[in-house]
Amino acid sequence: MSKNKDQRTAKTLERTWDTLNHLLFISSCLYKLNLKSVAQITLSILAMIISTSLIIAAIIFIASANHKVTPTTAIIQDATSQIKNTTPTYLTQNPQLGISPSNPSEITSQITTILASTTPGVKSTLQSTTVKTKNTTTTQTQPSKPTTKQRQNKPPSKPNNDFHFEVFNFVPCSICSNNPTCWAICKRIPNKKPGKKTTTKPTKKPTLKTTKKDPKPQTTKSKEVPTTKPTEEPTINTTKTNIITTLLTSNTTGNPELTSQMETFHSTSSEGNPSPSQVSTTSEYPSQPSSPPNTPRQ
């Protein structure tokens, strides 16, 4: 019923708030018009009343909102009180403590006093594990380990046979003559041939290729010695034939035989090298005395 009343009041407050806002807007519009003095006074009075009513409505709305919040806190308090009243009894794990069923706060206080008397100077926290039964729930309180550095637990020691098996893992059966432990060990070896060990081949390093080329040996070529061919002696050409002919003509102007010989000599010299006989004949003629020309007698 209280919820319905609160909802109704909230709705009425909202409606009044809206109507008052509309009235204020209308009164402000009418006041701007040029009306008579009496009408303006009445409008101003109405505006003052509406503004005060708006303030009152806002206060009521805030109060109702605060009233809505308070029941929730009361419900929470009631729930907590019910939980405290209906808490079940707790039983401890150790019956030697002699703790009777009671509230959990009393149990924890008694346990802390006992632990403080047995282990002074060590801080310990309680780890409670709840075990649910059909009707009651029991908590098992166990003192936690001290906060000092915990040593790692060593693994449990293995039996002697396994220890020997680990040590003598590669024992061939040929060695065992009358030793029973040796025979037991050599039987446990899986299908592995005795005496052979797996050898890992060393990995070959990749050979680095050198980009530089090997210098080739320079072969010195023997320079050919220029063989000087014997220069052939130039053939004596009788190029100066005009000089000889002029000399001969001056000496043999009157002898027709000499002129014929000179003509034959001139023809042979133009064709090629003269024979030694011709050369000798040409050289002999200047040495001969020139005969005087035959002048006709009168």
Swiss-Prot record:
Gene Ontology process terms (BP): adhesion receptor-mediated virion attachment to host cell; symbiont entry into host cell
Pro residues bias locations: 289-298
InterPro entries: G_prot
Disulfide bridges in this chain: C173-C186, C176-C182
Glycosylated position list: 70, 72, 80, 86-87, 92, 100, 105, 113, 117, 119, 135, 137-139, 141, 144, 147, 199, 203, 219, 231, 235, 237, 251, 253, 269-270, 275, 282-283, 287, 290
Region feature Disordered, mapped onto this chain: 125-161, 190-298
Composition bias, Basic residues: 190-207
Site annotation Cleavage: residues: A65, N66
Transmembrane stretches, start-end: 43-63
Compositional bias per record (Low complexity), positions renumbered to this chain: 125-150, 233-253
Keywords, ordered alphabetically: Disulfide bond, Glycoprotein, Host cell membrane, Host membrane, Host-virus interaction, Membrane, Secreted, Transmembrane, Transmembrane helix, Viral attachment to host adhesion receptor, Viral attachment to host cell, Viral immunoevasion, Virion, Virus entry into host cell
Extracellular side: 64-298
Compositional bias (Polar residues): 254-288
Pfam families with a match to the protein in the record: Glycoprotein_G (PF00802)
Annotated region described as Binding to host heparan sulfate, given as residue ranges: 187-198
Gene Ontology CC terms: extracellular region; host cell plasma membrane; plasma membrane; virion membrane
The protein's name in its UniProt record: Major surface glycoprotein G
Organism lineage string: Viruses, Riboviria, Orthornavirae, Negarnaviricota, Haploviricotina
